[in-house]
């Protein structure tokens, strides 16, 4: 039924619960698992300090790489091979773009990973993914 599963992670407890569900589904269904981490620098983080901004970006990118490595290990320990994708941009759009590009049959995301102000202004990542996805979306609480 679900041959390709895409899951978005950001290191939060909710995204790790979503990953656990995605790993178990991939194992039970012998599905391909693709784990996406999108490095997101909120507009409030931008400044005129180019070197400082680059330093922040590099730190966030390194956190993303480390998070994906942990996710791949977690999947491997459950007997599932996970392919990882590291992107830069807006998280919901990165997850949606990857799902579309990969021809995903299912997207798995955690609920409520954003802060209160950002959620108020833009909605949560899970809400946007569920709203605009071309395939079924599982939102894990």
Task: Annotate each language-model stretch with its function.
Residues 3-52, 78:
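Small/aliphatic-rich secondary-structure junction motif
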Residues 24-27, 100, 131:
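Solvent-exposed polar/charged
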Residues 34, 83, 138:
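Conserved beta-strand positions in the Rossmann-like core of class I SAM-dependent methyltransferases
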Residues 52-66:
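A short acidic, glycine-rich active-site loop
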Residues 73-107:
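Structural beta-alpha unit
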Residues 106-131:
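Glycine-rich, Arg-bearing micro-motifs that act as flexible, cationic patches
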């Amino acid at each position: 039924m679900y041959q390709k599963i895409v899951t978005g992670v950001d290191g939060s407890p909710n995204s790790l619960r979503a990953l656990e569900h995605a790993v178990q589904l991939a194992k039970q269904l012998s599905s391909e698992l693709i784990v996406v981490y999108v490095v997101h620098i909120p507009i409030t983080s931008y400044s005129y300090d180019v070197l400082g901004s680059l330093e922040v970006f590099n730190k966030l990118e390194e956190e993303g790489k480390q998070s994906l490595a942990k996710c791949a290990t977690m999947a491997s320990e459950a007997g599932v091979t996970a392919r990882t994708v590291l992107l830069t941009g807006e998280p919901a759009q990165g997850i949606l773009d990857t799902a579309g590009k990969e021809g995903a049959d299912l997207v798995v995301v955690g609920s409520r990973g954003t802060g209160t102000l950002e959620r108020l202004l833009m909605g949560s990542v899970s809400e946007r993914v569920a709203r605009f996805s071309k395939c079924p979306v599982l939102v894990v609480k």
